[in-house]
Structure formats: structure tokens, C-alpha cells
Regions:
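Mg2+/Mn2+-dependent nuclease catalytic core
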Residues: 21-40
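Intrinsically disordered, low-complexity regions of eukaryotic proteins
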Residues: 5, 19, 50, 70, ...
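Nucleic-acid nuclease catalytic cores
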Residues: 37-65
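Charged phosphate-binding loop/patch that engages nucleotide di/tri-phosphates or the phosphate backbone
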Residues: 71-95
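Basic, glycine-rich
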Residues: 51-53, 67, 82, 86
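Short, surface-exposed loop and linker segments with low hydrophobicity and enrichment for Pro/Ser/Thr
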Residues: 36-41, 79, 83
């Protein structure tokens, strides 16, 4: 089960999995991967990259990319970079 259940002003529910990493890899349990594979729509993963070499501290990925994200880590292209862009993206869901 994801960490957050959100609801925006457009009447759309969405879920968010939160991850923190000091490197480029993200760790997912088999249950987390299965959830995102089973529910690929309106599910998202937000990763916070820590450390002095973190270029884009907050990155958001679609849940449908969880298998690739587990394999490639933060090398995978994010759908949003930065908290402002993430907020705006989630706010616009269903518009």
C-alpha cells in the first residue's frame, strides 16, 4: 500500500509512494512493485535524493514505471522535477 492517498480539486484520487536515497538506486519491496503493476493509473513515486551531488532533489515518476525505476534508479527520466512541478502536476490531474 502506498504512503499517501491524495484527492485534488478536480475530484481525482491518486496515491504516492515516498522514497529517500543517498545514491541513485531505489529499493522496493515485492508488494510495492506488485501494487504499482496492478494499479498503473494515478499512482506515483516521489524520490528524494540526498547528498551533495543530488542535482534534482525531488523527482516524481509514474507508478506504471516501477519495474524500470527499480532497475535503473534515478537514471530513469522523471515525469516531474522539483516540489513545485510535482504539486502542479498532481493538482492538474483530471483537468
Amino acid at each position: 500500500m502506498p504512503d499517501l492517498l491524495g484527492y485534488n480539486t478536480n475530484g481525482h484520487f491518486f496515491t504516492v509512494e515516498l522514497k529517500v536515497t543517498k545514491g541513485k538506486k531505489l529499493k522496493f519491496s515485492p508488494h510495492q512493485i506488485a501494487f504499482h503493476v496492478t494499479h498503473p493509473n494515478n499512482t506515483f513515486i516521489i524520490a528524494e535524493a540526498l547528498g551533495p551531488r543530488a542535482v534534482n532533489r525531488f523527482q516524481m515518476y509514474r507508478g506504471s514505471c516501477v519495474v524500470e525505476l527499480a532497475a535503473c534508479g534515478l537514471e530513469l527520466e522523471a515525469c516531474c522535477l522539483g516540489l513545485d512541478a510535482i504539486r502542479d502536476f498532481l493538482y492538474q490531474l483530471g483537468a
